[in-house]
Regions:
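Acidic/polar active-site rim loop that often engages polyanionic ligands
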Residues: 25, 79, 140-150, 221-222, ...
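Rossmann-fold dinucleotide-binding core
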Residues: 111-178, 183-187
Length: 290
């Protein structure tokens, strides 16, 4: 099966690895510029090189995986794909435009799936000549076991079953979800991160204290502010805004502190600063501990 992955950023790279690591799958890793797609594959290669250096993978295995990932432009590589998974920026207009372009070039039997973390599958697919489905991976996509399979209003049952089968084939656990804002995981998880930001903003505790409390008291592997940085505070904010706008419920109001941080470019680990400062030696320091 040939899988097109649209977006060669962090999620796209992980999704590409998730498929390429399994026999029977090849991947077209696409972005809007050739060099961006090639850069995505380069980052994948560097990640595997670290595993080889630690003797966790063989070079032969890595070479085989990388040979199955072809970087390029969607108009060149996606014409013969059996499945296309979009992992572009979390913006409705971007996603609708991307799929409208793909609809003109992909073969009729190709399945369209979006990795959106919160947006309406029905709206993304509106106007297309084929069904749309949500196939929501979690970061890092090659290692996290869950895939949320989201059915929109017009998603046929056979498409849902096909995606669930593919998810199992690549070693994932599919959970079927009927379309709703935030789906399952993010409707629970992102408000928790948002509430942790309110606790920080109100001075109830400091960053290290909030994260330590949830790790030690709730047995979470990462504290909520640390996790927000890992996900990306811009992504967290976008999801909170979707939850609030879709439901109208004030409990989903985004914390002003997160909005202010995003406006200032402090997005978390990917920008080098969020609730923590990320140092060159891969250590991190809470911003309120300086």
């Amino acid at each position: 099966m040939k899988v097109g992955v649209i977006g060669a950023g962090t999620m796209g790279q992980g999704i590409a690895k998730a498929f390429a690591q399994v026999d029977g799958y090849e991947v077209a890793l696409c972005d809007i510029k050739q060099e961006w797609a090639e850069g995505g594959k380069d980052k994948i290669a560097k990640g595997y090189a670290r595993l080889v250096a630690k003797e966790k993978m063989t070079q032969e295995k890595v070479d085989g995986i990388l040979a199955k990932i072809t970087p390029g432009l969607k108009e060149d590589l996606c014409k013969d794909c059996d499945l296309i998974v979009e992992a572009a920026f979390e913006d409705m207009n971007v996603k609708k435009t991307t799929f409208a372009e793909l609809d003109k070039i992909a073969k009729p039997e190709c399945i369209f799936a979006s990795n959106t973390s919160s947006l309406s599958i029905t709206e993304i697919g509106n106007g297309l000549t084929r069904p749309m489905i949500g196939m929501h991976f979690f970061n890092p996509a090659d290692r996290m076991k869950l895939v949320e399979v989201i059915a929109g209003v017009n998603t046929p049952a056979e498409t849902v079953e096909a995606i669930k089968k593919i998810a199992v084939e690549i070693g994932k656990t599919p959970v079927q979800v009927n379309e709703a804002a935030g789906f399952v995981v993010n409707r629970i998880l992102i408000p928790m991160i948002n509430e942790a930001a309110f606790i920080k903003m109100e001075g109830v505790s400091d960053i290290a204290g909030i994260d330590a409390a949830m790790k030690r008291g709730a047995n979470h592997p990462m504290g909520p502010l640390e996790l927000g940085d890992f996900i990306g505070l811009d992504i967290c904010l976008a999801i909170m805004d979707v939850l609030y706008n879709e439901t109208g419920d004030s409990k989903y109001r985004a914390c002003p502190l997160i909005r202010k941080m995003v406006r200032g470019g402090n997005l978390g680990a990917k920008s080098g600063k969020g609730f923590y400062i990320y140092n060159a030696d891969r250590t991190k320091t809470p911003v309120d501990a300086q």
